[in-house]
């Protein structure tokens, strides 16, 4: 096809469309002033048309034909008609013409002139040449296949008669811009890209609308807040009928409670037992976990708070509610499900009771081998219950553990008894397989960590766990190798390494008072190894001593050893004997410790070394520096901190209890490592009255607490009824003082554990407890426990209990857990 054929096609188009020509002539008459600019536009279009016709000519010799000027002039009206039509239809209100043709202008190039029937109309994504104003229309009006411009209708009407000049005009425009013939795949990509941009524009518009609505809502909320008075901020909350308690029911629960936090926990169990059950609850979900499904909602808390406010009006203060009730509720609820998660993760699929592991019947023994074999075969099914520590064990561990590391070691003895039955086996293990050793069972180790994190929240951080607990467990396992003896030695349950002691030393077992206890359960009482000092040779120290007066004779060592409760207590008594100048009424020892740290003075290193010399003579493990540091240095520092005078020693001698002799029965199955248990620093045990609820010298019905003779803020004063309730729950006068501490210092017993920063006297770089409230505690102690030597009782029983209560973490209340156990059943 040459330029002459194109001009003839244009003539035919103009002849077949007289109405268009008339409209264009009318339009031209109204736009004479713009004729010059449009003529310039027309010339550029004809130039592009001429170049296109040259490229389309496949059989020509490459010489372009000249376009006659007459046919050029005959094309002017149609070209100008298209330009004017662009201006007329540029309004966004018109949707039947330009917007559609703007988004889908023209059609694709023809594959060949001989195949006109295969042409297909496809949208063009090039910008038209007839105005910048169409950029706005392109954004506002998406392309639509239903809306066809007159230009497209014209092309469809002439598709059977061959290519139209306007199609060639569009083709020439695309070629002028440097775009070649596009394939179907490219056009599909272009269409998807355009559709994506339209979707993005739509999303942007929706987001803008949402932001506008949010702004309107914020303004509305601000307006409403200005109209509501502060007294009306808390709306009236009417509980559903099934959650309403009668006055008698609420009174009964309140009488069993110790504080507002205790009452809140009891109400949680009473009102919402479904929160503690597994009904319709998918356990073992690896995606969400247990805590994601179980949580206290605001309506739960609001209902509980309403009931608590009836008996504790101060809870209406939000600060009191958040400080005294909310932390206890969250702590109790989270610990419940944390332990439930540990139980449900046990192997074998057996889920044991959450609150209390099944106790072994003391009267149940194996009568024959058949039963024993049956039990061994069924042992795999009961392994889950062996990995659950009951509440009583946890209470004992917490009472005696002075740090998270010690608590973890106690659990290690409980959950890994096989390592302590065979001592040489224990030294082959470490927490995570460090140092080429075998790794402990990850499941049981995770149980230890979970329990530790519950009672010591600071251990939830990985670094704290590794430094304080994992390292302490590794030290315990490493220490087993020191006491394991020779390779061929049979496993023992004795307290010390008998192979390293003289031949005349025998081992006294613990009295059998715990029939039927689980392996790993430890006793509170451990007796020292009896030693025949007549046959014992005491070597002279291999280091210089400042004077011979510090050396002890065999009789002195015998006397100190026989009056000691444990090897740690023996070291403490040596400290008292070798540093007499510190143990006077001035209590100068409070200014000293073994290392001189914490701003204190260092004890005489020579005499400390002499103490170690005597200790390792009777306890060879003390030769290891790590064992000495972990087991004895802390006890010596504790002995320096503790209040003690000659009066204390005489007071303890008066209350000393007879220790059973060698007639104690052997407990051959006692499979634990007793020497690692925490020794009693506080001197000989107190008489049975300390462990009974009858310590109160006055009948409770006749108990009347006089008013204090010193000024006390009214919130801290307790009624006679409250004092009687605390007395009923106390086990001793020291425990009574500790419970009063919790009652009168509520701000210290929260999840923040601020009490760890305090003690009675403010020693050891700690803060001192409020003297007024401490004086009030003593006032109540004197009213309940009137004795002649109240000063001794206060200093030797109450103050240590108060300081110990500040050191140890919160524990679960057993009575609450028992009730929760009933609810779960």
Swiss-Prot record:
Motif extent (Nuclear localization signal): 54-56
Highest taxon listed in the record's lineage: Eukaryota
Chain positions found as Phosphoserine: 376, 486
Keywords: Chromatin regulator, DNA-binding, Isopeptide bond, Nucleus, Phosphoprotein, Repeat, Repressor, Transcription, Transcription regulation, Ubl conjugation
Any one of the GO BP annotations: rDNA heterochromatin formation
InterPro entries registered for this protein in UniProt: BEN_domain, BEND3
TM region positions: none
PROSITE patterns according to UniProt: BEN
UniProt biased composition (Acidic residues): 1-11
PANTHER family given in the database record: BEN DOMAIN-CONTAINING PROTEIN 3 (PTHR28665:SF1)
Protein name: BEN domain-containing protein 3
Species: Mus musculus (Mouse)
